Amino acid sequence: MHGRLKVKTSEEQAEAKRLEREQKLKLYQSATQAVFQKRQAGELDESVLELTSQILGANPDFATLWNCRREVLQQLETQKSPEELAALVKAELGFLESCLRVNPKSYGTWHHRCWLLGRLPEPNWTRELELCARFLEVDERNFHCWDYRRFVATQAAVPPAEELAFTDSLITRNFSNYSSWHYRSCLLPQLHPQPDSGPQGRLPEDVLLKELELVQNAFFTDPNDQSAWFYHRWLLGRADPQDALRCLHVSREEACLTVSFSRPLLVGSRTEILLLMVDDSPLIVEWRTPDGRNRPSHVWLCDLPAASLNDQLPQHTFRVIWTAGDVQKECVLLKGRQEGWCRDSTTDEQLFRCELSVEKSTVLQSELESCKELQELEPENKWCLLTIILLMRALDPLLYEKETLRYFQTLKAVDPMRAAYLDDLRSKFLLENSVLKMEYAEVRVLHLAHKDLTVLCHLEQLLLVTHLDLSHNRLRTLPPALAALRCLEVLQASDNAIESLDGVTNLPRLQELLLCNNRLQRPAVLQPLASCPRLVLLNLQGNPLCQAVGILEQLAELPPSVNSILT
């Protein structure tokens, strides 16, 4: 065996590696300790730069050491000549680039480079753009580098058209580039600003069609890549609902005025001020939410003094002015009437479709046809199925209702991991459709039974509803937003999976509550019902609490008018 190199055994190799790691750790710890000692002693000189270089060159994510380097550089700025300082900065930029090669996603390194360039009188921004291009060529999804490029482009005043062309080159090379798509969504509104009268952030139709063609090429090439689908969703866009007072309701019996808004607001804050005029005279009132919580809400109410409800006069006029939204609404309470209200007749587009898209129906219809073509080729593509559903909702939710439900069934089978989310989304859409049908019929009764609902939403739209049927669904709770239903008299919620009644509070007109065959376990869950003063009928048949100890004591705490049915 003479003349042949000895091959180390695996045990010897492991031991050598261990010794090497120990040696590196000792050097690392000693250098770190030396830096901290010098910093504490105020010795901020070039030796600290050398010591921190040894550590950061191997581990660029040591944030404290970057702070040390900045302190040293700030100190040296006052001591070095312009020529020496220029050489120091050049060396620092080179060191930073070497650190980025070790870890291209180092927060500390990119931040330090921003800081350094921000202190130079004449930075070479062209060089920085080239640096970004090199690193993005290696990893086009490096969002640290994208952030830095946006910083450089802003500082160098690079025209948006040039940056858009840069995203073109990267997307052409690889469609799966979320950062490039996102950057386009930032650049296009700058290149094509809309007039003040137009929806902000939206694109001219010719630009939109060109972008839709580009993104269609992307998801027809790789239908499973989500980045193009997200961009497609942005292109079709959504509009912020216009500020509006949806409904104004006055109750003589409760001596209360209730207002619902198009968006949640915090009344009493500096920006959200409500003014109440009664018979053209201002009335100072205290506004509160139906659930009593001081937080943003769609619905706000106030108590009214007896003088403003005097039944001797022919009528009383109530006008609420929302100063921030620059809108107002007025309703009349006639003599002999117990309530009065004013609710605008709104369309589906005004209520819900603005959440989905503001584009023309011709564009949406074209996109729907394209997505259906892709779905025939890729029948199990979840992104395509979801987009089809959303496009149908944006076009005509009632016309496409049955077809939308079929697509939901397919989507749940394709993507079982998100079944709960899809059930909630389906429930949201079904409830929206039911609200629209109720609006068109101009009734105050809403039937939502046997719809397989898993969640309740848009309850602020139901301020005037007197009868609500939620029977035979899959609801597990009744949300606090239910308190917005100030006119509700009958609530049917039997045959669900309800475990809590926390949302059934402060319903001033509730008379009947049917909760048969739910999952109410403990008598204590009935406590919120004590805040419903007119409750007469409470049906609890088929709930576990009917056999629970203490049920009679808990029922005794409810208003004496309540007739409880347990068996």
Swiss-Prot record:
PROSITE patterns: LRR, PFTA. PFTA repeats lie at residues 44-78, 88-122, 124-158, 159-193, 207-241, 363-397. It comes from the Eukaryota. One of its GO terms (cellular component) is Rab-protein geranylgeranyltransferase complex. Its EC number is 2.5.1.60. The keyword NADP does not apply. InterPro entries: Leu-rich_rpt, LRR_dom_sf, Prenyl_trans_a, RabGGT_asu_insert-dom_sf, RabGGT_asu_insert-domain. GO terms for biological process: protein geranylgeranylation. The enzymatic reaction requires the aid of a Rab escort protein (also called component A), such as CHM. Keywords: Leucine-rich repeat, Phosphoprotein, Prenyltransferase, Repeat, Transferase. It catalyses: geranylgeranyl diphosphate + L-cysteinyl-[protein] = S-geranylgeranyl-L-cysteinyl-[protein] + diphosphate. Pfam families: LRR_1, PPTA, RabGGT_insert. The modification Phosphoserine is found at S98. LRR repeats lie at residues 442-463, 464-486, 487-508, 509-530, 534-555. One of its GO terms (molecular function) is zinc ion binding. Heterotrimer composed of RABGGTA, RABGGTB and CHM; within this trimer, RABGGTA and RABGGTB form the catalytic component B, while CHM (component A) mediates peptide substrate binding. The Rab GGTase dimer (RGGT) interacts with CHM (component A) prior to Rab protein binding; the association is stabilized by geranylgeranyl pyrophosphate (GGpp). The CHM:RGGT:Rab complex is destabilized by GGpp. Interacts with non-phosphorylated form of RAB8A; phosphorylation of RAB8A at 'Thr-72' disrupts this interaction. Belongs to the protein prenyltransferase subunit alpha family. Catalyzes the transfer of a geranylgeranyl moiety from geranylgeranyl diphosphate to both cysteines of Rab proteins with the C-terminal sequence -XXCC, -XCXC and -CCXX, such as RAB1A, RAB3A, RAB5A and RAB7A. This is Geranylgeranyl transferase type-2 subunit alpha.
